[in-house]
From Swiss-Prot:
It is found in: Cytoplasm. It comes from Pseudomonas fluorescens (strain Pf0-1). Homotetramer; dimer of dimers. Its EC number is 2.5.1.6. Pathway: Amino-acid biosynthesis; S-adenosyl-L-methionine biosynthesis; S-adenosyl-L-methionine from L-methionine: step 1/1. The keyword Cytoplasm applies. L-methionine binds at residues 57, 100, 240, 271. HAMAP family: S_AdoMet_synth1 (MF_00086). Its main location: cytoplasm. Binds 2 divalent ions per subunit. Binds 1 potassium ion per subunit. One of its GO terms (cellular component) is cytoplasm. Belongs to the AdoMet synthase family. This is S-adenosylmethionine synthase.
Length: 396
C-alpha cells in the first residue's frame, strides 16, 4: 500500500559484490555463533579483484577457519574461475579482525541477562502492509523474486550462459493504495560472451520475468529493460568493489519504509541495528496480521548501555481500526523490546544469518534448520504468533 501512484524498488543477486561481502560477514558470524552463542561479533568485508578483506571486532571463545569460510562462500555463489571474474579457490584472503572495545562491552554485559544494554545508540524501523501475502510491499517482493529466479536458472543449468552478478528493479502502479499493475521492469544479468543479445533477452523474458511476475499485472504498456546496455560480461568484484552493509534498502523494504541507517550483516544480536530492526518487523507484521491496520510502520530507538528503548513510535497511515496511541499501548503490553528480551523472543542465538544476507531479510518463510546438534527456526521475525493476542487485547 502506497501513497504514490508509481513506486519503484530494486534488488540484487547473491553474486552482486556488496552481497558477496554481506554473505561472507554473516557466514563468519554463523560459524562463530554455532560454537559460542554469547560471542560479540561485528564483521565487515571488502571484496575486489582477486582479494577478500575481512575486518572488525570479535570477542569469542570459538575458533573458526576464516579463510576457508570466505572461500566456501565465494565458490558456493558461483565464482569459481577467473573466466567468471573471481575465483574463491585462488583469491587472496586478508584477516584483520580485532577484539571488541572493553568500553562497549561494559555497557552491554550485565549480571542479570535481561538488563543487557543496547550495543549502541540508534533508531530502527519495522514495516508491514497487506498488499502481498507475505505482508511486504509489492515492488521489493517482485524485485527479490526476479533475482532469486536468475540464480535458480543459472545454478540449475536452465540458462547456462548466466553468470552470478545481477540486478532487478520493478515499478508498480497504485490506485487507491492498491497495486493495479507493473509499469516497468529492469533486469540486468551478467552472462558469458557467447550468448547473443536476442537469445539472452528471450531466455530472461520467458524463463525469469514471465515465470515470476503475475500475468494480470503485466500489460502491453509495461516497459521491459533487459540488459539495457546490451552487454554485461564483466561483473562481480572485478566490475565493482563490494562492501558489507551497502545494500540496506534492498535488505529491508525497498524504500517504502524509513530506515535508521544501520546495516544488518556481520552483527550478532546484541547489536540493535539488527535485532531491533527484526523486532520492528515482527511487531508491525503481527499488527497487520491481526487486522489492527492495513499498513504499519514502527520506530524504536536506544541508548548505548541502556536496556529499555528510549522511544517507541508508530504510524498506521490512517488505516488503523483503533488509534495509533492505543496500538502503541498494546505493543508495550504484548512485546518486550529490551535487547535481551528481543533475542529471547525471536530465538536469535543460532547460526541463521547467512541465509538472510541475499534476497532480503523480510518477507521470507521461517524454516526448520539443523546445524550440528542445534535445531532451530529461521526468519522467526516473520511469524504472526502474536496476532491473536493483539486482536484480543484490542477487542476486535
Amino acid at each position: 500500500m502506497s501513497e504514490y501512484s508509481l513506486f519503484t524498488s530494486e534488488s540484487v543477486s547473491e553474486g552482486h559484490p556488496d552481497k558477496i561481502a554481506d554473505q561472507i560477514s554473516d557466514a563468519v558470524l554463523d560459524a562463530i555463533i554455532a560454537q559460542d552463542k554469547h560471542a560479540r561479533v561485528a564483521v565487515e568485508t571488502l571484496v575486489k579483484t582477486g582479494v577478500a578483506i575481512v575486518a572488525g571486532e570479535v570477542t569469542t571463545s570459538a575458533w573458526v577457519d576464516l579463510e576457508q569460510i570466505v572461500r566456501d562462500v565465494i565458490c558456493d555463489i558461483g565464482y569459481t574461475s577467473s573466466d567468471v571474474g573471481f575465483d574463491g579457490a585462488t583469491c587472496g584472503v586478508m584477516n584483520i579482525i580485532g577484539k571488541q572495545s572493553p568500553d562497549i562491552n561494559q555497557g552491554v554485559d550485565r549480571a542479570k541477562p535481561e538488563d543487557q544494554g543496547a550495543g549502541d545508540q540508534g533508531l530502527m524501523f519495522g514495516y508491514a502492509s497487506n498488499e502481498t501475502d507475505v505482508l511486504m510491499p509489492a515492488p521489493i517482493t517482485f524485485s527479490h523474486q526476479l533475482v532469486q529466479r536468475q540464480a535458480e536458472a543459472r545454478k540449475s543449468g536452465l540458462l547456462p550462459w548466466l553468470r552470478p552478478d545481477a540486478k532487478s528493479q520493478v515499478t508498480c502502479r497504485y490506485e487507491g493504495g492498491k497495486v493495479v499493475g507493473i509499469d516497468a521492469v529492469v533486469l540486468s544479468t551478467q552472462h558469458n560472451p557467447e550468448v547473443s543479445y536476442n537469445d539472452l533477452r528471450e531466455g530472461v523474458m520467458e524463463l525469469i520475468v514471465k515465470h515470476v511476475l503475475p500475468a494480470e499485472l503485466l500489460s502491453k504498456d509495461t516497459q521491459f529493460h533487459i540488459n539495457p546496455t546490451g552487454q554485461f560480461i564483466i561483473g562481480g568484484p572485478v566490475g565493482d568493489c563490494g562492501l558489507t552493509g551497502r545494500k540496506i534498502i534492498v535488505d529491508s523494504y525497498g524504500g517504502m519504509a524509513r530506515h535508521g541507517g544501520g546495516a544488518f550483516s556481520g552483527k550478532d544480536p546484541s547489536k540493535v541495528d539488527r535485532s531491533a530492526a527484526y523486532a520492528g518487523r515482527y511487531v508491525a507484521k503481527n499488527i497487520v496480521a491481526a487486522g489492527l491496520a492495513e499498513r504499519c510502520e514502527i520506530q524504536v530507538s536506544y541508548a548505548i548501555g541502556v536496556a529499555q528503548p528510549t522511544s517507541i513510535s508508530l504510524n498506521t497511515f490512517g488505516t488503523g481500526k483503533i488509534s495509533d496511541d492505543k496500538i502503541i499501548k498494546l505493543v508495550r503490553e504484548v512485546f518486550d523490546l529490551r535487547p535481551y528480551a528481543i533475542t529471547t523472543m525471536l530465538d536469535l542465538l543460532h547460526p541463521m544469518y547467512q541465509e538472510t544476507a541475499a534476497y532480503g531479510h523480510f518477507g521470507r518463510a521461517p524454516q526448520t534448520k539443523t546445524v550440528g546438534e542445534d535445531t532451530f527456526s529461521t526468519f522467526t521475525w516473520e511469524k504472526t504468533d502474536r496476532a491473536d493476542a493483539l486482536r484480543s487485547a484490542a477487542g476486535l
